[in-house]
Amino acid sequence: MNFIEDLKWRGALNQVTDEAGLIEAMASGEIGAYVGTDPTADSLHLGHLIPFMVLKRFQNAGGKAVIIIGGATGAIGDPRPTTERQLLSPEQLRQNEKGITEQVTKLFGDEKTAIVNNNDWLGKLTLTDFLRDYGKLFSINVMLKKDVVASRLETGISFTEFTYQILQGIDYHELWRRHNVQLQIGGSDQWGNITSGIDLIHSIEGNNATAFGLTIPLMTDSSGKKFGKSEGNAIWLNPEKTSPYTFYQFWYNQSDEDVVKYLKYFTFLGVDEINNLEQEAKNNPGGRIAQKRLAQEVTKFVHGEQAVADAEKLSAALFSGDVANLSAADIADAFGGVPSFDITSEKKNVVDFLVDGEVEKSKRQAREDVTNGAITISGEKVTDVNFEIDPTKHYDGEFVLVRRGKKKYFLGKVK
């Protein structure tokens, strides 16, 4: 399969301006494709991974991957369908640019990759030059019809955000000129901005200039929810914001209805292997064989093989209940979302500990659960109601992990 056929099979193609022309251009020699991202945060998240997966496939097909960090456009903000974006300070933008650049470098490597900042050319563009060289090439009537602009006309859109599509068009032309970029990749909501860039290239370079646009379908799960969040929280690519274990678990916990779609889109596995995993999922529903492979592949791509090994080691320990030898970092990682309570480092009777931490509603219930073997403290079952808990001896003196019954966890945090 060629690049386009592969995208179609993977469900990763929404629109393309000239399919035959793009295939011909890719076959004729190395061309570049680009994805742009504005540094609105200090880390990429799963939403960014959607266009980056297509760009990585383009790179694997022999093309050059170009990533724009929007140092200039990030100071303005791509228009939202409903409200104006909050502007960031120059200092915050620079910090965000640094974090995103490090992540992109890890994903794409150094070969056949260019990471550029549009502040290098937009930052030097005077208002007079902008109006004379570019403004005259854009029709207000056409710009008003772009979906994201049209949706804001009633509620109001600033001139700043209105001109964003011109700046994105300038980006495409600059990359066309500097890096032989002939393809822009974006989400389905970027179609208007992408075609504006193609029109600008044709206006400046002539209608024979080869420039293409490709958009990706909106990614949703089987229930129709927008992909990329876990219980309302963004899944970040920065391991300090979303740990590799949490990242791994996000993929492992995908439903049987979604897993094949995500295997196609977010991994580089071939047709036969994915078809085999799909068949295994059908033959053994709930077995999570396909989910495990999905989690392994995506975690390896983003965080590396060691992160996969560490995540699976932690998962195995949690599944078996053998948590006594985990590190404090592992405990914070795996149990950060369970009910928690503050404790001191001083010793305390287990019954008082359970009641004070609201693990148990009464001392009577606490004594009963301890006596019946329903209470486990940091991996060790406690059956003596006179047992004293010494927080300094648990997980580097940072946590005490309580399990009531088989699955109900609570975390005491030393303050």
Curated annotation (Swiss-Prot):
Keywords: Aminoacyl-tRNA synthetase, ATP-binding, Cytoplasm, Ligase, Nucleotide-binding, Protein biosynthesis, RNA-binding. Transmembrane segments: none annotated. Its EC number is 6.1.1.1. GO terms for biological process: tyrosyl-tRNA aminoacylation. It catalyses: tRNA(Tyr) + L-tyrosine + ATP = L-tyrosyl-tRNA(Tyr) + AMP + diphosphate + H(+). ATP binds at K229. Homodimer. This is Tyrosine--tRNA ligase. It is found in: Cytoplasm. It is an enzyme of class 6 (ligase). L-tyrosine binds at Y34, Y164, Q168. The gene is tyrS. Belongs to the class-I aminoacyl-tRNA synthetase family. TyrS type 1 subfamily. Catalyzes the attachment of tyrosine to tRNA(Tyr) in a two-step reaction: tyrosine is first activated by ATP to form Tyr-AMP and then transferred to the acceptor end of tRNA(Tyr). A motif ('HIGH' region) lies at residues 39-48. One of its GO terms (cellular component) is cytosol. Residues 348-415 form the S4 RNA-binding domain. The keyword Ubl conjugation does not apply. A motif ('KMSKS' region) lies at residues 226-230. Pfam families: SYY_C-terminal, tRNA-synt_1b. GO terms for molecular function: ATP binding; RNA binding; tyrosine-tRNA ligase activity.
